[in-house]
Each structure stands twice: as C-alpha cells, then as structure tokens.
C-alpha cells in the first residue's frame, strides 16, 4: 500500500525527522489560506499522486510549455494560480503511463534554501537478508538515470537486525553521502529514526529523494515516499486510514476483497492461474509468442467456485483484454471447481473475447467434461505451449 507525500512526511515528523511546514488542500479556494499559514516567502506547490517524476511531468490539459507537477511560487497569488492549473487536471509522468493520474489534492509547503540534493532509501536487501540503506550523493529527479548510467555512485549499507543502526552505520552512511558539520550531527538522529519508522510500520520501501543539505548546513527531508507491506496492515490501523483508493486500480481493489493476488498490467491477454510461479511462467510464454499479459492473477490453491468467478469477472472488466488464458495445475485446487467457476462467470458477464483453458491435475477429466458440455465457446489446450499459441492465434485472427 502506498500513501501520499504529505502523509509520509507527517509520519516521519512523528519520529523526529526534519520536515518543512506544509498544508494539504483539496480545493483551489483553500490555497491562499494554506500559503498564509506558512512562513514564506518561498512556497512549493506539489501534486499529490502515487507516482514519481512529478516535477518533470506534464499536464494533459495544459500546453506543452506549462510547468510540471511540482512548482515554486514566490507569492500567495502565484500559489493560487498554480493551484487553479493543477487541481483536477491529469498529470502524466514517467511512472503513470500515457493515461496519467488526476491530481485531486495538492501539498503546499514552505520553500527551502538547498545547498545539496542527496538520495536515501531503506528497503529489504534480499541478497543479504537484511534491511539496508541505499544512498547516493546524486539525489533529485534523475536518480533513475544515475542508477542506470553510473551505478557506482549508489552505495548500500546493510543493517544488523539485532544491533539496529549503530554509530558505525551512521558514520558509514554519512561518509557515503559526504556529510560533515551540522549535517553529520543531524545524521546521528535522522538515520536511526528512519530505520525505526521503517521497521515499526512494516514498510516495504521508505524513500527520501531528495534528502537535502540546506545552506545553513542542516538536513531536511524534502520529499518522502512510503510503501507498506500489505500483509502486515492488520497490525496498523493508523496506516490503513491513510489509504487513498482513488489512486489505486479499481480491479486491484476488488481483487483484494476476494483475497486474490492481482496486478493490472498493460497488455491485452488476461491471465487466470493458480500459483505465483505458474502465473509468471504463463506471462513469460505469452511474451515469447509476441503478446503482452494484461494482468497477473493468482487465484491461490484453495479457491472455490465463487472466488474463481470473481477473478474471471475482474479480468473481463478490463477493456484492454482481447483474449483470456486460464492455466490451472490442480493440486489442492480441483480442475472441476475451476471449470464450474469459469462457466458461472461467463454465463453472468458474457464472453466477448476468445477464451483458452488449459487444465491439468486433480479431477482434470471431470473439469474438461464440464467445459465441453457447457455449450460455451471455450477452446481447450493440452499444455502451456499449446495454450499460449492458441490464445495468440485467436487474437491475431
């Protein structure tokens, strides 16, 4: 689960991290009062969407010359003018895809005198099985380019889970970021605080980009991104209240209600599979034959007829889907249950695109019999390769 920047900063402020004063608004009419409540005279007006690259993004409804999703303002009047242009319009960034995301809220923040921009994130480094700091002196909007072009400028410092962030860890991170003076002193409290927040709130990612050194020498969290482990949300009612479902794919929200592992993708072949490994193999072979999967959908090992039907309806609700491939290896999951669920869903929502079903495992013959006797336009496949060829051929006509 992701949250907005202003929410992430409020959470970090509770852990003692240095953040600027700011106010989130939902309406243009709130912009002037929000700006007046801040010290000024420099303000930053930030689009709040769950995507990076906002500063370099462009609004669909505005001219190409218009400014992006993060703007400086030197007066309250300029803050209001920016709010009028940004709220309600669609921001397209490198991470949103061509569709973009509608900006429904802004964060108006006090400006900062920036001396240096740094990068700092915390994540689980699976290569060593520990939480790690990933840092670079090259922070700001182009961190992706740094990672691609000059990866040697990014350093990783793994943390011993028993010891936590030690003085030696702080020194190593500070050295990697070339901190000295007041910034190095601030680091002694900031990095342990970030680590504590990451662990206590069961985050999957905590990214501060940029972490700035101000002209007075002190550190400040200028932007913050947080992603939480969805499997741990039951422990964090305070975090769950921060969820903004308008920023999420409606199909993924519906899937979560049925405990389905569903991720929307950009392709045109819908996939329904049991087991994450088989799901990834199915997506791979679709790509091998020249098409792209429209989703990752794992119905799990113990799904019943209703859950299978729900998964099928979610897949068919995607207007990009031009064909559907159901690939089931029945172990705990029985092939006849899959067949009954697919048929129930098809009868309810109709079938306007080609459907290929490959079944193998427990009750496979019964499952095939149910499909064959359904009278529906369902194409059977003998194996995964055959299934992929058939669904691609059906789409290509």
UniProtKB/Swiss-Prot annotation:
A GO molecular function held by the record: succinate-CoA ligase (GDP-forming) activity
Pfam families reported in the protein's UniProt record: ATP-grasp_2, Ligase_CoA
Cite the binding residues for Mg(2+). 209, 223
GO BP annotations, alphabetical order = succinyl-CoA metabolic process; tricarboxylic acid cycle
The UniProt record lists the keyword Iron-sulfur? no
Q: What is its EC number?
A: 6.2.1.5
Positions binding substrate in this chain are: 274, 331-333
Q: How is the cofactor bound?
A: Binds 1 Mg(2+) ion per subunit.
* Essential cofactor(s): Mg(2+)
Catalytic activity annotation: succinate + ATP + CoA = succinyl-CoA + ADP + phosphate; GTP + succinate + CoA = succinyl-CoA + GDP + phosphate
Where do the ATP-grasp domain residues begin and end? 9-254
Q: Which GO cellular component terms, listed alphabetically, does the Swiss-Prot or TrEMBL entry include?
A: cytosol; succinate-CoA ligase complex
Q: In which pathway does it act?
A: Carbohydrate metabolism; tricarboxylic acid cycle; succinate from succinyl-CoA (ligase route): step 1/1
Enzyme class, first EC level, given as a word: ligase
Its domain of life reads Bacteria
The alphabetical list of record keywords is: ATP-binding, Ligase, Magnesium, Metal-binding, Nucleotide-binding, Tricarboxylic acid cycle
**Binding of ATP, residues:** 46, 53-55, 109, 112, 117
Q: Which PROSITE patterns match?
A: ATP_GRASP, SUCCINYL_COA_LIG_3
This molecule's function is given as: Succinyl-CoA synthetase functions in the citric acid cycle (TCA), coupling the hydrolysis of succinyl-CoA to the synthesis of either ATP or GTP and thus represents the only step of substrate-level phosphorylation in the TCA. The beta subunit provides nucleotide specificity of the enzyme and binds the substrate succinate, while the binding sites for coenzyme A and phosphate are found in the alpha subunit.
Q: Which HAMAP family match?
A: Succ_CoA_beta
Subunit comment for this entry?
Answer: Heterotetramer of two alpha and two beta subunits.
Family to which the UniProt record says this protein belongs: Belongs to the succinate/malate CoA ligase beta subunit family.
Can you name this protein?
A: Succinate--CoA ligase [ADP-forming] subunit beta
């Amino acid at each position: 689960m992701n949250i907005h920047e202003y929410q992430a900063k409020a959470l970090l402020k509770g852990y003692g991290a240095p953040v600027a004063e700011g106010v989130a608004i939902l309406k243009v009419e709130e912009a002037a009062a929000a700006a007046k409540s801040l010290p000024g005279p420099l303000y930053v007006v930030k689009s709040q969407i769950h995507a990076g690259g906002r500063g370099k993004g462009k609004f669909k409804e505005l001219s190409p010359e218009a400014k992006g999703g993060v703007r400086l303002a030197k007066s309250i009047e300029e803050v209001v003018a920016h709010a009028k242009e940004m709220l309600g319009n669609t921001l397209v960034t490198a991470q949103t895809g061509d569709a973009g995301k509608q900006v429904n809220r802004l964060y108006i923040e006090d400006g900062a005198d920036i001396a240096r921009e740094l990068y700092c994130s915390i994540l689980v480094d699976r290569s060593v099985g520990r939480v790690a700091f990933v840092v670079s002196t090259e922070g700001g909007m182009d961190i992706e380019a740094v990672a691609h072009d000059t990866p040697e400028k990014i350093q990783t410092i793994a943390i011993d889970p028993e010891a936590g962030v030690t003085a030696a860890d702080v020194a190593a991170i500070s050295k990697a970021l070339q901190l000295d003076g007041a910034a190095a002193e601030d680091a002694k409290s900031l990095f342990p605080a970030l680590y504590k927040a990451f662990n206590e709130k069961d985050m999957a990612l905590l990214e501060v980009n940029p972490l700035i050194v101000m002209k007075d020498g002190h550190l400040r969290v200028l932007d913050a991104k947080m992603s939480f482990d969805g499997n741990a949300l039951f422990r964090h009612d305070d975090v769950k209240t921060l969820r903004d479902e308008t920023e999420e794919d409606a199909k993924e929200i519906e899937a979560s209600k049925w405990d389905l592992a569903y991720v929307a993708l950009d392709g045109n072949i819908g996939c329904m599979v049991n087991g994450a490994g088989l799901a990834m193999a199915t997506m791979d072979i679709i790509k091998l034959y020249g098409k792209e999967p429209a989703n990752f959908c794992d119905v799990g090992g113990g799904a019943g007829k209703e859950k299978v039907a729900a998964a099928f309806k979610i897949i068919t609700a995607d207007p990009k889907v031009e064909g559907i491939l159901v690939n089931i290896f029945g172990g705990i999951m029985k092939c006849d249950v899959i067949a009954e669920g697919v048929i129930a869903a098809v009868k309810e929502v109709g079938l306007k695109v080609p459907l290929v079903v490959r079944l193998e495992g427990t009750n496979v013959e019964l499952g095939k019999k149910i499909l064959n006797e359904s009278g529906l336009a369902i194409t059977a496949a003998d194996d995964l390769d055959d299934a992929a060829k058939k669904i691609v051929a059906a789409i290509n006509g």
